[in-house]
Amino acid sequence: MYLLVRMLCEGGLMIALALVLGLLKVFELPQGGSISLEMLPLLFFCVRWGMGGGFIACFAFGVLQVFIQGAVSWGWQSILLDYVLAFGVMGIAGLGRGKPHGIFWGSVLGGAARFVVHYISGITIYKILAPTEIFGTVFDNPALYSLIYNGSYVGIDLVLCLVIFGILYAPLKTYMTGACLLYTSPSPRDA
């Protein structure tokens, strides 16, 4: 029971931190997507607590982001894909839980999963926005457009997260891997 309460508290804090970081955008693209550090606390939580808690926290963040930050969308399908599902699948980063350097490869998995959902959204829903002419030549490739457009901001977000995790890895290794949870037990009066 103690660990469940702790996970819920940490999850709420990480979701709130992700929402605040999502408001602090370095750059915002015209059809949605921005460069920010909103993935950082979510990936951190996923790797610390695993896939179960990670999927729930990331899904909750995606839903809250629609209502708090607003959604750039072309209908309910793009809201479902670009917000709820794209962030929800980041919970796969929880596969890195308890593994050596799991924060890094777990983050890459989570970021890649998010990119795949944005990519699918780009080639199915946003293909109408793909340019028809580039450098004076005909361009009719929504798959390439989605790859470049979505890869530009998700890739930069992921690299920023990995750099910060690299800086924090040595001092926070026990916390990042969740090893401190193995040795934490409530005091007798908490039972």
PLM segments and residue spans:
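Individual transmembrane alpha-helices with interfacial aromatic-anchor signatures
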Residues: 140-160
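Residue-level signature of the transmembrane alpha-helical core
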Residues: 12, 55, 59, 63, ...
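Alpha-helical transmembrane segments and their helix-entry boundary regions
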Residues: 54-58, 75, 103-110, 146, ...
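Interfacial aromatic-anchored transmembrane helix boundaries in multi-pass membrane proteins
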Residues: 21-34, 60-95, 126-130
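Hydrophobic transmembrane alpha-helices
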Residues: 1-48, 52-56
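Juxtamembrane/transmembrane-helix interface segments of polytopic membrane transporters
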Residues: 18, 22, 118, 122-130, ...
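Short helix-perturbing small/polar motifs within transmembrane alpha-helices
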Residues: 7-20, 78-123
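Single conserved hydrophobic/aromatic residue that forms the stacking wall/gate
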Residues: 183-191
